[in-house]
Regions:
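Asp-based phosphoryl-transfer active-site loop
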Residues: 1-16
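Short, flexible loop segments at the rims of nucleotide/cofactor-binding pockets, characterized by
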Residues: 14-17, 37-39, 77-78, 126, ...
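Active-site phosphate-binding/coordination module
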Residues: 18-117
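Phosphate- and divalent-cation-binding pockets in alpha/beta enzyme and binding domains
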Residues: 47-50, 160, 190, 216-217, ...
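Short, structured coil segments at secondary-structure junctions
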Residues: 55-56, 64, 164-168, 220-221, ...
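Short hydrophobic/aromatic-enriched beta-strand-loop microsegments
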Residues: 57-64, 170-173, 224-228, 242-243
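Conserved acidic, metal-coordinating active-site core of Asp-based
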Residues: 91, 95-208, 212-220, 229
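Asp-based, Mg2+/Mn2+-dependent phosphohydrolase catalytic module
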Residues: 220, 224, 228-260
Length: 260
């Protein structure tokens, strides 16, 4: 069986960034039993915590399906064309949004358009803690942007911003923020690339997730598992709701389905 795992809120506790030992042990045990574990995350590949990188995953679906890697081979690695960036940056500023541009190797922020939402400071500290850079767009874009997120503050007009960029991106609404993936990408599209490459039917798949950007993945697989700490929409899309991350939810669900 091929089993897909989100990272934040699924493999790792999103706030504390703790990776439960039970989850790490479960991934190793799946491999020993002949199953194929694959990461399926919204994070770009270079933003993945080294503790997760050290686990024996067979594949990596990153940036919501824009980057897909099987073993040492890239099946897909799609970044935002540099010529789009001036219009995106100008539209963010005009519509008073807060923004994080998630690039290869780190974050680009945008001065006053990235310093008013507390989540940006939290995410910037986390990305620095794993060796990634945090720079300002005014210093120049030395690395390609993979995807970006906007955060609402009083006076933001996200709707007007989406009208500008909808020709290029599909937004994912995440309660006061939005994640922007290049059109045609999703966690479900990414996992299908992996399945096509290894010749596995959807019926022989399972996925673990917790949030809104996991919905395409949860709806696509044969067996969908939502973490106990997940959002209500993800729970409704799942076949089984397990315990929370910190209650060893990964291990609990895999044992429930007889995979460990």
């Amino acid at each position: 069986m091929v089993i897909f795992f989100d990272i934040d809120g699924t493999l790792m506790d999103e706030k504390s960034q703790i990776l439960p030992q039970s989850a790490a042990d479960a991934i190793a045990a799946l491999v020993e039993k002949g199953h194929i574990p694959v990461v399926n995350t919204g994070r770009p590949y270079t933003h993945i915590d080294p503790r997760v990188r050290a686990l024996p995953f067979a594949g990596w679906i990153c940036a919501g399906g824009q980057q897909v890697r099987l073993g040492e081979r890239w099946l897909k690695n799609e970044t935002v064309p540099m010529e789009w960036m001036p219009e995106i940056i100008e539209a963010v500023r005009r519509n008073n949004l807060q923004v994080v541009y998630e690039a290869e190797g780190g974050f680009y922020l945008d001065g006053a358009y990235s310093d008013k939402h507390p989540e940006i400071a939290i995410q910037s500290a986390l990305i620095r803690s794993i060796g990634c850079y945090v720079r300002d767009v005014e210093e120049g874009l030395d690395h390609p942007v993979v995807k970006f997120c906007t955060f609402d503050i009083p006076g933001s007009n996200r709707g007007a911003f989406i009208e500008v960029v909808k020709q290029w991106f599909d937004p994912i609404d995440r309660r006061g923020m939005a994640e922007f993936l290049i059109k045609g990408n999703s966690k479900a599209a990414g996992l299908q690339l992996v399945l096509d490459a290894i010749g596995c039917p959807l019926a022989d798949t399972m996925a673990f997730g917790d949030s809104g950007n996991d919905l395409p993945m949860l709806k696509a697989v044969g067996t969908a598992v939502c973490m106990g700490n997940g959002v209500e929409e993800a729970k409704q899309a799942a076949h089984f709701v397990t315990k929370s991350v910190m209650e060893d939810g990964i291990d609990y669900a895999l044992r429930h389905f007889g995979l460990l």
